[in-house]
Design a protein with these regions (language model features):
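Short beta-strand His + acidic residue motifs that chelate non-heme Fe in jelly-roll/DSBH
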Residues: 60-62, 80-82, 106-108, 114-119, ...
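Amphipathic alpha-helical packing elements
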Residues: 49-53
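A short, N-terminal "cap"/entry segment at the start of jelly-roll beta-barrel domains
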Residues: 1-46, 91-98, 150-159
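Short acidic-glycine-tyrosine-enriched beta hairpin
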Residues: 70, 84-114
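Glycine- and acidic-residue-biased ligand/ion/polar-headgroup-sensing regions
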Residues: 55, 66-86
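Double-stranded beta-helix
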Residues: 5, 90-92, 99-100, 115-159
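A short beta-loop-beta micro-motif enriched in histidine and acidic residues
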Residues: 38-47, 57-70, 101
Length: 159
């Protein structure tokens, strides 16, 4: 389970020390992921997170039905992978931080099954989702492995 850091400030400034703390939490986490929830409540109409991911983490393909989503790479590089309903890869996009020669921002209006795989030792992304947060009742398709080792194998093959 990713390490979750909750914000309690109405006005939040992100500084280099905070970024390093989030990255350190990711390094210590068994999931190799840590996220700062920038919003105050799951009920907020906009959900924003600063997420640190170490190489080797496994983010299961997911989608947010009926909600828009955007993501900006702040540091490092990822492979964004999109899947069709049957688990076939339909698109791969290498993304990097601004100033790289890669795409650094995406926005989905209708969210497909997707995941990201870190291509560098550490990745920091800023994700924005339409709120409020509602835990999906959608059953993940059979092509998404529940076993962590099988999930990593799927992601390595897809990347």
């Amino acid at each position: 389970m990713p390490e979750v850091i909750k914000n309690s400030e109405n006005l939040l400034f992100i500084n280099p020390e905070m970024v390093e703390n989030i990255k350190e939490e990711a390094r210590k986490s068994s999931s190799l992921i840590a996220r700062l929830l920038m919003h105050l409540s799951h009920e907020d109409p906009v959900q924003e997170m600063l997420i640190a991911m170490c190489r080797g983490c496994a983010v299961a393909p997911n989608r947010a039905l009926g909600r828009s989503e955007s993501l900006q790479v702040v540091e490092g590089e990822i492979m964004l992978i999109m899947f069709d309903e049957n688990g076939e890869v339909i698109q791969r996009v290498e993304m990097g931080s601004p100033g790289s020669d890669k795409a650094f921002l995406y926005r989905f209006t209708s969210t497909p099954w997707h995941t990201m795989v870190p291509l560098t030792e550490m990745v920091m992304v800023h994700e924005t989702l339409q709120g409020p947060f509602v835990q999906s009742s959608e059953t993940p398709p059979e092509w998404i492995p529940q076993d962590p080792t099988e999930l990593k194998n799927l992601l390595n093959q897809a990347a």
